[in-house]
Design a protein with these regions (language model features):
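Catalytic phosphate/metal-binding cores of nucleic-acid and nucleotide-processing enzymes, i.e., regions
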Residues: 1-118
Length: 118
């Protein structure tokens, strides 16, 4: 399976264009690395530089390396938009909550089990 991940606001903090100040999201990076280790194809896709025309590839590659992100390809030039509509899109928070090993999912299933046995 091929997974395509946004970078800012997904794998790191959203710094509103101050990319050198981005802080890694260690939980998401661990999940990406798990998928990579399972043999999935990991593609990074970012809008960095789309509005300014500046080339952020070197910084982005350095950050991904420093953060220990495992990936196969980096695509720059994602169009800038206020909202992306895509038949295969999922919000990062929803994706995290719906993983079978996520704490949120375990809490939901535990709550369901408790209600069932009352």
């Amino acid at each position: 399976m091929t997974y395509c991940f946004d970078i800012d606001g997904t794998l790191c903090s959203n710094t509103e264009g101050k990319y050198d100040a981005a802080e890694p999201n260690r939980e998401m990076i661990a999940e990406v690395n798990r998928l990579y280790s399972e043999g999935h194809t990991i593609v990074m896709h970012t809008a960095r530089g789309s509005t300014t025309g500046l080339d952020w590839r070197d910084l982005t590659e350095r950050q991904l390396g420093d953060w220990g992100v495992k990936y196969h390809a980096l695509h720059m030039g994602k169009p800038t938009a206020d909202l992306y509509v895509d038949d295969k899109a999922i919000n990062v928070r929803d994706w995290q909550a719906n993983r079978t090993d996520s704490p949120e999912r375990k809490l939901d299933s535990e709550a369901t089990d408790e209600r069932r046995y009352r």
